[in-house]
Amino acid sequence: MTIHNLKQLAVGERLQHAFLVWDVQTRSYGGDKDCTVLTLSNASGRIESAPFWGADQQRVAGISKGLVAQVIGEVGEFRGKRQLCISSIRVLPDGQVDLSELLPSVGNTEQYWRKLDEWRQAVAGPRLRKVLGLFFDDDDFRRQFEQCPASPVGHHAELGGLLKHVTEVAAIGRMIARISKGDEDLLLAGALLHDIGKLECYTWNGVFEYTDVGRLCGHVVLGSLMFDRRLRECTPAPCLDGEANLIQHMILSHHGKEEFGAAVRPMTLEAEILHYADNASAKAASMAEVLDDPTNFNAEALVTSKKPWQLDGRRGYRGRFDWGVES
């Protein structure tokens, strides 16, 4: 199936395309002025529909989040934001379209697995290698880890996003640990395991969403429980209790502060490094996503036309110079 790049659509362009219905919202503007707006998704991104007003809302009465629909429409613009003016929409049967073609993805994950497994094999301590093997030598775990997004929306919100994110965190963290004379192998373990709770926190078979337990407990707590459960299932114990506590602490503290979701604040050098490496990967990915999306800019402008939510109320700047380098 041909994938239209939603970030490069021109006003007036007509589309006939299968989309994943990412969201359905009813918006009220006072009195009886209600409208329905669909958010449609494919592997390249998302676009909102033009509002369906009044009786016209019946056209999308059977459309719900997570369905796949065949859409015919024309790209329009309202207040500087592109939207799809839908002339026809119908729900497609399950299985007619491969969902992987409608979801954002990191693409080929081989490069991330190659680096991750190379780092694991170089870990000096046999007990630490054993702990990591409890997870990454498990084929079911690897299959889930390879697919899971790092977030439903936000940084690395794509199939394989978690694998890409932890690879970045490990690369950043190991370098800082080397400079700071920290334990590189322990840092690696924390980087690879800090977000394992997201496997139980999110669903990704269609729209990326939180599970019930994900909303109730959060990925930090779920990750801690998963880690404890795996170690208890292993006989004899793969490592000393004190060693396990160091990794548990990194899982529980990687958000840095309680108000940002940490169960405790970092108390070890490796936990402190992990927190900032995690943040660096997330923030850099968010900035790159904003700057790569032409819908955030007016024409050839270098500064974003708005303050994207990913940048916490800041604008972005995409200007680049060659510094005299000859191409």
Residue locations for each model-derived region?
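Short, acidic/hydrophobic/Gly-rich beta-strand patch recurrent on exposed beta strands
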Residues: 37-42, 204
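OB-fold single-stranded nucleic acid-binding module
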Residues: 24-34, 46-50, 54-102
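Acidic, carboxylate-rich catalytic segments that either coordinate divalent cations
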Residues: 267-327
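Acidic/His-rich, divalent-metal-binding segments that scaffold phosphate/diphosphate chemistry
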Residues: 97-216, 257
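OB-fold nucleic-acid-binding modules
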Residues: 1-15
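Divalent metal-coordination and catalytic microenvironments
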Residues: 19, 66, 169, 278
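Divalent metal-dependent catalytic cores for phosphoryl transfer on phosphate-bearing substrates
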Residues: 153-155, 164, 174-294
